Amino acid sequence: MKKQIEVVGAIIFNDDKVLCAQRNENMSLPLMWEFPGGKIEKDESEIEALKREISEEMLCDLEVGDKVTSTSYEYHFGIVNLHTYKCKLKEKMPTLTEHKSIQWLDVKDLETLEWAPADIPAVKIIVDEV
């Protein structure tokens, strides 16, 4: 049986734009786009994990809003259960520490990127809300 990996993703809004993060060349799913986030640690809630991951990866703090969706996707390395939330930055803009690049895109343009498969359902939900 494949390993289940619980992860969170932040759909970070700034006015009418959404933060998109491109995975590094040496990460799994190299150069694909994703909503930033990461693995949920033992005894950690989804929201706690989201705040911690964004603080560690992007050196900024989040205001976490409504949950968008939970999706599962089976990769060769395991089954990723991704829980995405609408978020806003508290103050500081994100700093790249792990990702190759970031972009702020209009919601209508989100589908122009090559997204990691687990993120695609959340992308579609956000685009359909506009």
Regions picked out by a protein language model, each given a short descriptive name:
Residues M1-V18, K39:
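Conserved N-terminal beta-strand and adjoining loop/helix that marks the start
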Residues K2-K3, V127-V130:
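Generic C-terminal helix-cap and adjacent flexible tail
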Residues I12-F13, C20, C87, W104:
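Conserved hydrophobic "DFG−1" position in protein kinase catalytic cores
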Residues K17-E56:
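Conserved Nudix-box catalytic region and its N-terminal flanking loop in Nudix hydrolases
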Residues L50-I54, K67, I102:
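Hydrophobic packing within well-folded, soluble alpha/beta domains
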Residues D61-E63, T71-M93, Q103, V107:
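Active-site-adjacent beta-strand/loop module that shapes the phosphate/pyrophosphate-binding cleft
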Residues K86, T95-I126:
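NUDIX/MutT-family hydrolases
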